[in-house]
Structures are given as C-alpha cells and as structure tokens.
C-alpha cells in the first residue's frame, strides 16, 4: 500500500529510530499525550503561565536576524487585532519563509514566552485557517520522536499526519480481534473505533474509551498466554504425590521448632502441602518480607519430601548465601538423622566426588548449592522437591534444567524477599501460584529509618560509636556507580580511611566488587563472626546475609539507590532482639522524586507498599527479574504499574476462557487461539514465553 508522505527516507528513519517496519506497527505507535485544541485565545489573553495555547490571526511581516555565520533567526510578526506576537524559527528557516504568507490567516499553536517585552512562540505549529475548522480539532496527539528524527524534519506533527493518512487509507472497518462475548459485557468499544479515537479523539472521553479498549486487549492476550502455558504445564507434568507426613517433619515440629509459627507461615505450609498431595507438579512463588520466616517454611516442606522417600535441594544465588543456608538448616535439624551437603564451585576434588556419590545413591537427603547444582554431572537418586532462593537471579531455563534431574519434575518452590506488586506478579510470574507470608514473627522491633543530611555526619558518627560500645555491629554502604568502578573504589578507599580515623578504636572489614571472591568471603566472614565491628562496602550487601548482632545500616548518598535497593539493604538489620536503625544520608538538595523515595522509606517498613511505590516511580522495565522471568513483555500502551484494575479484569476474562477450553479445541474460542498464535509469531514479543 502506498502512503502519501512516506518516502524511502522516512521509511528508513522510522525503521532505524522507532523500529517501525509495518503499517500495523505504525498504527500501534500511540501518542504519549494530548492537548485540547478546541479553544482559540486572543493575544491580549496570553500569559507566560499558560501551557500550550492557540491563537488565530494574520502574518504582518517577516524579519531575518543574523548573529554570526551559523546563527540565524526568522521572526514573523503576527496579529489577531488585539495585539502582536512574534513567531520565531531558529531551524527550518527556509521552509517557514517559503511556506507561510503575509496577510494569510493562520491558526498558531505553541507555548507563549516573553522576549524583549513581547510575547513569542518558538517553532509553533501552524495551520491554514481556511482548511482547519475548530470543530475538527479536538484533542491534538503528541508522539515521541528522537533528535535524529527532528533533524530530518520528522517531528510529532509529521507522525500525526502519517497516522491520519494511514487511517484514511485503511478499510472502513478494521477486523475485530476480541469476540462479542468479551467486548459487550465490559462495554468496550470496537477495535476500529479504538484505533481511530486513540490517534484522533475529539474529546477526553473518546481518548479514555480508546485507551481502555487497547490496554485491555494487550493485557488480555498476555494473560491468556500465561494462563494457557500454566494450564498446559499442569496437564503435561504429573507431579510426585506426597501422601504422608512422617518422622522427619514430626520430630522437627515437636522437638526442634525454634519458635511458634505465625498464622501466615501455617497458611503457606497448608497451601504447599495441598500442592504436594495433588499429584500435579507444584510451581509456587513464596513472597515474604525480610525476616518473615520463608526459610523455615521451605525447610518444613523439604522434610515432607524426605518423609515420602525423596531428596530435596535448595539453590541460592551466591556461595555465601548457600553456606548460610547450610548453617541455618544444620542448626534447625540438630539431632535429626538427616544428611545435608553443600555443592558450590569451591567444593572440589575428593569432597565433590563424595557429595555426587551420595546424591546418586540417595544417601544425601538435602543438597544446598548454587548454579553448580544444575551441572550435568549432578545426578539425584530421587529428587522430589526444589527450593529456588531469590528467583530473579535464575532464569526459567535454569529452573527447567532441574526438572531433568528426575523422572517426574520435582515440586518447585520459588522464594523471594523482594516483594512483587500483585499486578506485576500476575504478569511476570503468571505461571506460578503465589503464596505470601504477610506477618513477621512476634516480638521483633520495627526498624527505625532516619533521614540525615551529609552536613550532620558528626552526630551520626557519635550515634554509631554508642551502638558499637553497647556491643552492636554496623554496616556502612557506599553507592555503586556502574559506569565508573574506579571512582567507586577511590570513594570507598578514601571513605574507609576517613572512617578509620573517626573510629580508631574499632575493627573494620571492607568489601568491594573488585575483590577476589575468596577475599570478599573472608572479609564478610569476619563481620559475620563478630571479629570486626564495622563493615564498609561499595557493593550491595548480599540479600539474605544474616548477622543478628548488626543493628545499624548507614547508606551514604542514599539518593542514588532505588526504593527496592534501599529496602533490601535495610533488611540486613533488625534480625536480633535489639532496636535497629537505618540511616539514609543524602545531600541537602534533592529532586522531588528522590525526596518521595526517602519519605516512603521513613514512613513504612512494609515491603509490599514499598514495591508498589517503586513500581509507580520507576515502571516495570527497571525491576530486577522481568527479563529473566521468561515473559519478555514489551507493552505498547498498557502500564502494569498504573493499570492494575485492567490487569485484573484481563486476567479474569482470560481465566474464564482457560476454564471453558483448557485444551484450546472448542470452535467458539478459535478466534482467540488464532489471534494468540499470530501474536506469538510476529515481533509483538509481549506474548512470548520461553
């Protein structure tokens, strides 16, 4: 199809800059904002406080000013009878001088500013008043364009014209992609109307109708794909049935349980137990804030696997966390006849062979490890239950590799201490059932979060000294600037020396990203064992590191960290019985968004509230794990952070389809399955599941 205004040059720019290669992709390049152009102002009404406005009048004359060889400026003096404004061009001067005529009537649209005592519009949008009627104008769309596009004359207005021409060329009614039994009960407009109204709404209401329809459709097919994948997976993979709770679980529960379980822990154990007993493979995400007792729930679930004659495995993202899990589990199971082994990159030689042999014979009951666990040389006699700690560090492919270690896929429990907002969990982890531990063990004191400016360091140092003299330990974290490790290291070294001078009486550990793993582990271990009182680090301290005696977390230049990062760091303290503190140190001048982050941290310790706020401030694209999750979604118009109700609405409708046609064979749903197949084949990759 030929489209006026779309020559080879523009086609190439759209492809290079916006990755638009088809008419469909152009149609799905939506405006990012709209401006109401239904009103004409007079020049006498103008004010510099006004946003974009439009005026109607005539060009009186042109003047060209030259300031140096390359600095030209074209000014058109424009009047509507109530006053005079200047229309100014610094680029495209020849085009403007050639196109716009003196004494012809135009509608001018732009942002009024003042220069030399007179209102001016720089690079305004100009329409011939004889061809543009006020009733046709309505809401003007604005499209994102790159600098290279602007230099080539392809600004928002050019995209707008292309969209208008394309819509005029298209068939009278675009084919529908949602059936009436979905569209009508939800009062959605047709797909054809939605495309026409999204690019050319006459009113704000028309724009909202179009956005709702297009957002819903996008999210519906994402959810349908996820739920279909989960449904297929459940049918395809029969799981081991754990029919009994025996001596391992009961001995632990009656003799070794260190404290009473919270109601949330009991609820989650019941959910896991029901999955294990169902005969289908469990795929469950366990969310719980730092210190909520996820590891204990995972351990008790592993003991049920042991009671049914199976082995269990827990995968951690780093060696230090794997070692910590090993220590914790051994302490929990003290006196119970369970063989627990560690398998990481540092376990080599004869010791490694012993562990591998024990796994192959079934003599090793619980294996704790890192990525080393999924190597081909690791073979289990009967692997029945797998715990994956901190899912965002592992991909779906790595999870799936564990399934190949057993005749039937083992039950999988994915744990994360990074709270995931519900709408995002539905999209990223939509193939997993979700359990939440939403209460902390009783008696734990909430961490107090305090904001201090970098001009208040003297009083901060005094507070740190008092805590250490009372027998506590302190973390001090320097920010990591990814682009400049050398500067980070210099900052850390200088900061470390300053701290040594401030605290000559205390012992300090230092950890940074350029250290060899064994040196980093050794320094961390000194702090864990209490040999040093202060740990100074330039990298984020590993999630899960447990030092109950550490009561103060100082985060320097806290404005450089995201909300989730700050919350994770704060979670390193507050693990003992003593009152703990998190001190956020920033410069005095803060951007509004940064101040919001700091205020949220000081207001709440609730990880789910923080995750929701973080999602709204940053959007889902920045959240760790969205790409590793197996759902690579590139939503064109929907926003997971702000469209929670539409996500839920889309999931409800998708679930109805899956319930009615789990095998995708019924003729009344053929339209949906065909559309889903189309989306998965095309470059609309939000429907792809790895």
Region spans (language model):
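Helix-hairpin-helix
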Residues: 1-18, 103
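Short, surface-exposed secondary-structure boundary micro-motifs
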Residues: 58, 111-112, 225, 558, ...
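Upstream accessory/linker segments immediately N-terminal to the RecA-like ATPase cores of bacterial MutS
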Residues: 65-256
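Inter-lobe coupling/hinge segments of SF2-like helicase ATPases
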Residues: 270, 281-599, 663
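Accessory helical-bundle/CTD segments and flexible terminal tails appended to RecA-like ATPase motors
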Residues: 505, 524-534, 541-548, 553-556, ...
């Amino acid at each position: 199809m030929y489209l006026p205004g779309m020559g080879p040059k523009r086609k190439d720019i759209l492809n290079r800059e916006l990755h638009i290669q088809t008419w469909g992709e152009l149609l799905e390049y939506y405006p990012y904002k709209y401006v109401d152009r239904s009103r004409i102002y007079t020049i006498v009404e103008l004010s510099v406080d006004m946003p974009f406005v439009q005026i109607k009048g005539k060009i009186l004359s042109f003047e060209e000013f030259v300031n140096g060889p390359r600095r030209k400026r074209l000014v058109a003096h424009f009047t509507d009878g109530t006053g005079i404004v200047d229309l100014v061009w610094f680029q495209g001067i020849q085009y403007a001088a050639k196109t716009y005529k003196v004494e012809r009537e135009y509608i001018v649209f732009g942002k009024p500013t003042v220069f030399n005592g007179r209102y001016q519009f720089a690079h305004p949008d100009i329409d011939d008043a004889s061809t543009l009627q006020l009733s046709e104008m309505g809401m003007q769309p604005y499209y994102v364009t790159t600098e290279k596009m602007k230099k080539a004359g392809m600004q928002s207005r050019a995209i707008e014209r292309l969209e208008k021409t394309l819509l005029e060329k298209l068939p009278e009614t675009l084919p529908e992609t949602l059936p009436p039994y979905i569209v009508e009960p939800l009062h959605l407009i047709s797909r054809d109307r939605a495309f026409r109204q999204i690019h050319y709404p006459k009113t704000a209401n028309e724009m909202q109708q179009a956005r709702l329809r297009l957002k819903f459709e996008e999210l519906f097919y994402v959810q349908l794909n996820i739920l279909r994948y989960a449904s297929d997976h459940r049918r395809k993979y029969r799981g081991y049935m754990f029919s009994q709770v025996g001596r391992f679980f009961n001995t632990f529960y009656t003799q070794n349980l260190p404290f009473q379980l919270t109601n949330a822990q009991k609820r989650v154990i019941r959910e896991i137990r029901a999955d294990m007993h169902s005969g289908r493979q469990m795929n469950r995400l366990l969310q719980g804030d730092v210190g909520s007792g996820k590891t204990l729930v995972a351990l008790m679930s592993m003991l049920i696997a042991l009671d049914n004659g199976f082995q269990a495995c827990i995968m951690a993202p780093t060696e230090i966390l794997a070692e910590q899990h090993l220590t914790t589990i051994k302490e929990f199971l003290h006196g119970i006849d369970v063989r627990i082994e560690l398998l990481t990159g540092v376990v080599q030689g004869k010791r490694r062979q012993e562990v591998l042999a024990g796994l192959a014979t079934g003599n090793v009951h619980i294996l704790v490890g890192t990525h080393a666990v999924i190597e081909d040389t690791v073979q289990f006699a009967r692997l029945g239950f797998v715990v994956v700690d901190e899912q965002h560090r592992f991909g779906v492919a790595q999870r799936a590799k564990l399934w190949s270690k057993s005749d039937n896929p083992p039950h999988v429990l994915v744990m994360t201490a990074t709270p995931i907002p519900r709408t995002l969990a539905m999209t990223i982890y939509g193939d997993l059932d979700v359990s939440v531990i939403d209460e902390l063990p009783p008696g734990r004191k909430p961490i107090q979060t305090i904001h201090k400016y970098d001009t208040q360091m003297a009083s901060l140092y005094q507070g740190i000294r008092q805590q250490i003299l009372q027998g506590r330990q302190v973390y001090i974290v320097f920010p990591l600037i990814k682009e400049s490790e050398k500067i980070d290291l210099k900052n850390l070294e200088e900061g470390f020396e300053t701290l040594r001078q401030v605290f000559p009486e205390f012992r300090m550990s230092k950890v940074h990203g350029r250290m060899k793993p064994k040196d980093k582990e050794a320094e961390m271990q000194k702090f864990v064992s209490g040999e040093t009182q202060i740990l100074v680090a330039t990298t984020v301290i590993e999630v899960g590191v447990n030092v109950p005696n550490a009561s103060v977390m100082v985060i320097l230049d806290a404005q450089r960290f995201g909300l989730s990062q700050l919350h994770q760091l704060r979670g390193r303290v507050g693990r003992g019985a003593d009152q703990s503190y998190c001190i956020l140190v920033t410069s005095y001048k803060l951007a509004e968004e940064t101040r919001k982050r700091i205020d949220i941290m000081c207001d709440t310790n609730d990880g789910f509230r923080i995750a929701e706020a973080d999602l709204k401030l940053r959007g889902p694209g920045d959240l760790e794990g969205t790409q590793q999750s197996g759902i690579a979604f590139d939503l064109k118009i929907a926003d997971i952070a702000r469209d929670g109700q539409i996500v839920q609405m889309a999931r409800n409708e998708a679930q109805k389809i899956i319930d009615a046609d789990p095998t995708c064979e019924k003729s009344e749903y053929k339209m949906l399955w065909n559309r889903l197949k189309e989306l998965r084949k095309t470059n609309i990759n939000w429907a792809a599941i790895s």
